[in-house]
């Protein structure tokens, strides 16, 4: 099915589009297998932030331009002393900020993977809530081969997903795994033919759109809290506070303060 994706905002190294309440963030550097630079990452952070705040958007897709690669990680050509160097000549690892944003954004984020998801690209796949993989997808880590590693979500959370033994294999041996192998280890949710991957991804997104956004928000926060320690608890607590602010009980406390009177909390139920 051909869809008319609407461009929401123009960027240099990514695309940011909208279709039927679904945002799509596309890394647009196919000439380098969608490897990212600090500028690519900053643009993705901006797009994801806008998607978080946009009331039209229920679900977000992350993908790469073309059929050959989802993302091949950081562009080694701009890797300098202490990080990846952008236009400002400051070495950065701002992809860590993007990883955290994908984790805490209160909307489902779905990785749509075609071709290579390697290195930092595989880590982006890992931190997404769900993954729809094309049958040509290839996953793996390369860090120890190129003098790098991800000791955060890319290893610790990966181990939660595929098990510690498998995660160590992935990192220690730096092998590549096809789509079926990724499915078997729980790294992706489903595998479909390449020409059907967008249809399947959009179908999953449309199914989630039919469900309670508050329920999905809290489920995401709860699962994150299990793995993210106090940072995860902070996310869930913040979501709970926002929900509480919408209740008559919370409004009674606010209004009583503004009206300089004692609040009447006795009127509200005390559920067991």
From Swiss-Prot:
One of its GO terms (molecular function) is 1,4-dihydroxy-2-naphthoyl-CoA synthase activity. The record marks 84, 245 as: Important for catalysis. Pathway: Quinol/quinone metabolism; 1,4-dihydroxy-2-naphthoate biosynthesis; 1,4-dihydroxy-2-naphthoate from chorismate: step 6/7; Quinol/quinone metabolism; menaquinone biosynthesis. Hydrogencarbonate binds at residues 141-143. Its cofactor is hydrogencarbonate. Keywords: Lyase, Menaquinone biosynthesis. This is 1,4-dihydroxy-2-naphthoyl-CoA synthase.
